Amino acid sequence: MRHPPPTRDKLPATNTIRASDMPPIPDEIKQFGRAHLPRSVLDKGHLIAFLYRQRFSKPRIPDTPSFDDEGDRYFSSRMPKARIYLEYGSGGSTIVAAKSRVRFKTVDSDPFFLRAVENKITTEFGSSNGDFVYCNIGMTELWGVPIFKRPSATRCIRWKRYPLAPWVNHDASFLPDLVLIDGRFRVACALTTIKYLTNKVSFEILVDDYGDRAEYREIEEYAELSSMQGRMAVFKPKSAVHLDAIDRAIETYSLDYH
């Protein structure tokens, strides 16, 4: 039986678990009703329909990511060269990683979608070198966006855990040379990755939708924008990163789920 969400003062030290460790969807979730949702959500009938499909239908996981043509070509050509791969936001990109047999870790805020990705990989490949990490940021809608967007104390704690999710109980041997930022909290995820890879000489961070988002420019303070592949930005390490400054920026952008 799934336990109710923890109260503000009882949040566990970590809020990330492997997708394979998640309990089955309980019958109680069928009790999910209108009384539990705020009016702002009730006004969105499409969201109610999405939540139902999210829980009771089998999502179709694509074989390739939904990048534009240039981004897709770059990602597809770069993956076979990677030794260790990290991504924020699972989906077709995870399938590409599994096919490449690269060691990988994927983080997602939608447990139902993440479970479907893992099941597809297990079914098609039997096993993988992957680690599937679910980070609970609260109930989510399409693309793993939090439904409840007001930054309450409890939500802030949860949101700040998302960029840190792949680094909790970190295996020192897991130092990715290729990182895709295509989930939530993209600036904070990029900056957190840069911080943890400070001593790594060579790596690439790919940030999708970069060309459309002026707020993502903060990343350029801490990494070199090497090229644009369509709407995808390719970053490489700077020679020096001021950790105090990057910590302050992470604190700020950990509350921005875009």
Predicted features by range, described:
Residues 1-66:
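Membrane-proximal basic amphipathic "stem/tether" segments
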Residues 50-65, 76-80, 144-164:
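Glycine-rich phosphate-binding "P-loop"
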Residues 65, 83, 87, 179-183:
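Short, charged/polar micro-motifs that form catalytic or ligand-binding hotspots
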Residues 69-142:
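SAM cofactor-binding core of SAM-dependent methyltransferases
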Residues 70-74, 91-93, 161-169, 191-192, ...:
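A generic local structural motif
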Residues 113-122, 141-144, 214-219, 235-239:
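Short, charged, surface-exposed secondary-structure boundary motifs
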Residues 119-173:
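S-adenosyl-L-methionine
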Residues 168-258:
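C-terminal substrate-binding/active-site "lid" region of AdoMet-derived donor-dependent transferases
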